[in-house]
Amino acid sequence: QLWKSFRDFDPSRPVFTEAESNRIGRLQCPPSLWRRLGQGRVVLVDLPLKERATLLAEDYQHFIQNPQSLKDTLDGLRRLRGHDQVNRWHQQIDSGDWPSFLESILVDHYDLAYRLPGSEDSVYPKPSHSLEIPSANSADFEKAAADLISQYP
């Protein structure tokens, strides 16, 4: 399915990708494609933390509906993030404090796992500019997408 998507791209038009790692789930990005992604222009897209947490809550409803499964998954992070941090996450989940948990998992785990574009150990160059998205509503996303597309004719 991933290959089919790549194959359908028009090489004369810009392609926008998220600056992720060279793995997509269990799939490994081909080295030649990974190198090519690192040669592209980088735009830092920024969304406020509370809005990012809202998106997580929408996208991961299965964890909110089954908190024990989430806690079991988080237990796998004890060596990486420490017992104190994982215990705090468990407490937030047990008390139903989803906003605090989601913000913490972003700041104290997810964001720490990524290298900033332009940093010494990143494959990506420094961002050429940034794009601020004020909220996670579809109108703001559509406006941001239109703004971005207009800069890359």
PLM features per residue range, with description:
Residues 35-153:
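Conserved NTP phosphate-binding and transfer environment spanning the P-loop NTPase/kinase superfamily
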Residues 1-35:
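Conserved nucleotide-sensing/catalytic segment adjacent to the nucleotide-binding pocket
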